């Protein structure tokens, strides 16, 4: 039941809900949309890094090289490899005695 369709009224036996007809198509549609929204919010919080990384970079691992001459492709690969090699130099080996 949606909170927007419920009304609590005091009766002799205590509190009871007088809800609108739950077979109303609008209530059913709103309930389904609410449940789907809740599921998507939970999945978004659990997997936001994976989801947004996929959206940002797509399924490919790097920029497209379609239409680029082979010499430029090789130059790009060398630049990428040298950048990785430079990053490897930041690690420090610590020996415990």
UniProtKB/Swiss-Prot annotation:
Region annotation Disordered: where it falls in the sequence: 60-83
GO CC annotations on file: host cell plasma membrane; membrane; virion membrane
Tagged with keyword Nucleotide-binding: no
Positions on the Intravirion side per record topology: 44-97
Its membrane topology: Single-pass type III membrane protein
TM spans (from-to): 23-43
Lipid attachment residues per UniProt (S-palmitoyl cysteine): 50
GO biological process: protein complex oligomerization; symbiont genome entry into host cell via pore formation in plasma membrane; symbiont-mediated suppression of host autophagy
Keywords: Disulfide bond, Host cell membrane, Host membrane, Host-virus interaction, Hydrogen ion transport, Inhibition of host autophagy by virus, Ion channel, Ion transport, Lipoprotein, Membrane, Palmitate, Phosphoprotein, Signal-anchor, Transmembrane, Transmembrane helix, Transport, Viral ion channel, Virion
One Pfam short name: Flu_M2
Site positions (Essential for channel activity, possibly by being protonated during channel activation, and by forming the channel gate and the selective filter): 37
Quaternary state and interactors: Homotetramer; composed of two disulfide-linked dimers held together by non-covalent interactions. May interact with matrix protein 1.
Similarity comment: Belongs to the influenza viruses matrix protein M2 family.
Domain notes: Cytoplasmic tail plays an important role in virion assembly and morphogenesis.
Record-linked HAMAP family: INFV_M2 (MF_04069)
Extra remark beyond the main annotation: When the channel is activated, one or more imidazole moieties of His-37 probably become bi-protonated.
The protein's name in its UniProt record: Matrix protein 2
Lineage of the species this protein comes from: Viruses, Riboviria, Orthornavirae, Negarnaviricota, Polyploviricotina
Gene name in the database record: M
